[in-house]
Amino acid sequence: GRWRWRWVALNYLLFGAAGFQKGSTGRLSAAARWLLAPYLLAARINAWLWTRRRPQPDEVLPGLWLGRLPSSAELADGRFRALLDATAELSCEPQGLAYRSLPLLDLVAPDVEDCRRAAVLIDELLAQGPLLVACALGYSRSATLVAAWLLLSGRAADVESAVAVLRRARPQVLLGEAQRRTLAALSGSVPEPSAELGEVRHA
């Protein structure tokens, strides 16, 4: 009924990503899955419609991939050793991968602290091997987090350079004004670009 959609609205207005009750294992709580069932189904369908012509992830730098949240079957192919999941609204089965969840609302720009946390997690997960950073489409939330890592690791000198790196790999990346403002706010502590631009080392 309509009240279920109102719960989604409350998440955006009051509760934030926590309202989806996504746990550290990647699954939404049973209560959230029941309360939000129509919205969750719509989110899955929307993700499929937007990415059906290009479902595959793209390698931004060696060992670092950007894409939509994969299905269990897609994760089982062994391409990745680690997954950073930026969705709040979609459940995920990590399939034994090194997994971290950083739930973010769709259509809402991450804040600076989200971006800093993501950069730490990306460094941590890259040590495990090939890493996929994912959101529902792989175009905005996850792209913003990877851009933040590029900036904070010195692999990009400024926001436009970071966006250019992303779009060379994944042309559909879309970072709006709000996302760019967040990334620009990181610039005060961004180091000089690395001499080894583009190189990602694994432990």
Identify the meaning behind each predicted range.
Residues 132-145:
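Cytochrome P450 heme-iron axial ligand motif
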Residues 20, 71, 142:
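Short, electropositive, low-hydrophobicity segments enriched in small/polar residues
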Residues 1-51:
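N-terminal membrane-anchoring alpha-helices
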Residues 44-133, 149-186:
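Cysteine-based protein phosphatase catalytic domain of the PTP/DSP
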